[in-house]
Amino acid sequence: MKSRKFFSKLKEESYDVSIFDLMNAKVYLEKDMTYLPQDYKKGYIEDFFTFFPEVLKEIKNKTEEEIEDFEIEDEEIKRVELRLCSMGSKQTGRESYEKLVKTVINYLIFINERPLHALTTRFPGGKQIIEKNGNYYCPIKNAQSNELSICEFCICKDLNEL
C-alpha cells in the first residue's frame, strides 16, 4: 500500500477517536496497569495521555501532500495490527484503547518514523529515550523481545548502542 493512501486511512480513523474514547482508554490503561508501582504507573499514564492526543492532533492537521509517498508492505501492516490486538487484557474500555493505539502507533511506525513512547516517558530504573544526531535510543528496546511487545517495530535502537 502506498504511504499516502495509508495515511489517508489513519487520518480518517483519527476523527473516529472521541473524547469519550480517550477517557475510556485511560480507565482501561489504569486497570491494565494495576500491579505496577504507583509512581511508574502515574508517570506512564500522564505521558501516554499527553503524547497520544498530540499525535492524533498532528495526524488531523497534516495533509496527504505532506507525506512522502512510498510503498509499505501490507504484510508489515498486518503484523503490527495482529500484535496490537494481542496486547493487554480484554476488559472494559479495550475497544477505545485499541482505536487510539492502532491509529497512533501505525502512524508513528509507518509514516512519521518516531519512537512509540514520548521522549519524556520514564522506564523502570528512571531511564528514558535519548535522541542523538537524529537517532533514538531506548533503554528497554532489547529487554522487550517477547511475542506481545511492539518494540521490534519501533525506530529506536538499543541504548547500549549509544
Swiss-Prot record:
Transmembrane segments: none annotated. Signal peptide: none annotated. Belongs to the UPF0305 family. This is UPF0305 protein MMP0665. It comes from Methanococcus maripaludis (strain DSM 14266 / JCM 13030 / NBRC 101832 / S2 / LL).
